[in-house]
């Protein structure tokens, strides 16, 4: 199978010049600002999308923005579990994580996936550095207990899954000041050193809050948030989100994504978007063009 060409590579010089001209006011506006990107979905597994993501992140850094990448790795974890004869289980979009699964999560996210992303960014001219929650005490966590919808008095034990208690941003800010691009694996650590698997959407949202990010972009495998008829919802308010939760329009893996996005919007992140990671250069389209892509989340 031949690799699909990057659409940017076939644009005429005039169109490229127009795109650059359109980007200029956004580059000015966001210069020096932090942009947190949750990297996941097809953009992590398709080669052409991996390349466009890496180029986008490096370009954003070169023009004066401060991208911070928080990555997922669900398919890679599932593959590793299958190789040892285990099947992944989810409750309300959160992976149930026993001790053996936690070992796999640490190895896959903090090792294989993180290093692949770091190398990919560095190969196209960036300076990326990988972090887990243990580095600089970045992500401190406690064991998460899920609400049992059938019996709220009996919470569900989902294993080594964590709730964030504190994010210590000093190490991220130090890397940004030295022109590095932080790449963060969603693994937190308890006071006793216990490792916890934390949903990457939750980590991205909290990281955006603590860093005072200008924007939070959540990459997904859909055009954005869709209604029950499959139509893209361009913007969502807090009230609309509550209604979509209640009627089941937002469910499964989209639940933590939207909840974390709304929390970030409520806690000072100026702009929160769910973007289609299957679109090449979706980060540049969302940040540096008039059009944008996906769904905007508002706290109002």
Curated annotation (Swiss-Prot):
Pathway: Amino-acid biosynthesis; L-arginine biosynthesis; N(2)-acetyl-L-ornithine from L-glutamate: step 2/4. GO terms for cellular component: cytoplasm. It is found in: Cytoplasm. Coiled coil: none annotated. It holds the Pfam family AA_kinase. CDD domains: AAK_NAGK-C (cd04250). Keywords: Amino-acid biosynthesis, Arginine biosynthesis, ATP-binding, Cytoplasm, Kinase, Nucleotide-binding, Transferase. Gene3D superfamilies: Acetylglutamate kinase-like (3.40.1160.10). GO terms for molecular function: acetylglutamate kinase activity; ATP binding. The keyword Zinc does not apply. One of its GO terms (biological process) is L-arginine biosynthetic process. Substrate binds at residues 73-74, 95, 197. Its EC number is 2.7.2.8. It is an enzyme of class 2 (transferase). Belongs to the acetylglutamate kinase family. ArgB subfamily. This is Acetylglutamate kinase. It comes from Bordetella parapertussis (strain 12822 / ATCC BAA-587 / NCTC 13253). The lineage of its organism: Bacteria, Pseudomonadati, Pseudomonadota, Betaproteobacteria, Burkholderiales.
């Amino acid at each position: 199978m031949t690799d699909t060409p990057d659409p940017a590579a076939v644009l005429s010089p005039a169109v490229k010049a127009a795109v650059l001209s359109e980007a200029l006011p956004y580059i000015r506006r966001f210069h020096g600002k932090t942009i947190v990107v949750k990297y996941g979905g097809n953009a992590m597994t398709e080669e052409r999308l991996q390349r466009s993501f890496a180029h986008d992140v490096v370009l954003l850094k070169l023009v004066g923005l401060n991208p911070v990448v928080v990555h997922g790795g669900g398919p890679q974890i599932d593959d590793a579990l299958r190789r040892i004869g285990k099947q992944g289980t989810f409750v309300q979009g959160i992976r149930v994580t026993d001790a053996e699964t936690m070992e796999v999560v640490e190895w896959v996210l903090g090792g294989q996936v993180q290093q692949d992303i770091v190398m990919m960014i560095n190969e196209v001219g960036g300076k990326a550095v990988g972090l887990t929650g243990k580095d600089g005490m970045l992500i401190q966590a406690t064991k998460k207990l899920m609400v049992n919808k059938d019996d709220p008095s009996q919470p569900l034990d989902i294993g080594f899954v964590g709730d964030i208690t504190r994010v210590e941003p000093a190490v991220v800010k130090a890397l940004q000041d030295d022109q590095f691009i932080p790449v963060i694996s969603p693994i937190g650590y308890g006071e006793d050193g216990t490792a916890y698997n934390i949903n990457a959407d939750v980590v991205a949202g909290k990281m955006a809050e603590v860093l005072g990010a200008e924007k939070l972009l959540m990459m997904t495998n859909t055009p954005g948030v869709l209604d029950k008829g499959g139509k893209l919802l361009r913007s969502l308010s807090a009230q609309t989100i509550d209604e979509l939760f209640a009627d089941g329009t937002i469910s499964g893996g989209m639940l933590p994504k939207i909840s974390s996005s709304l929390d970030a919007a409520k806690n000072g992140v100026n702009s929160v978007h769910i973007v289609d990671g299957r679109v090449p250069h979706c980060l540049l389209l969302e940040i540096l063009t008039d059009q944008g892509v996906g769904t905007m989340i508002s706290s109002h």
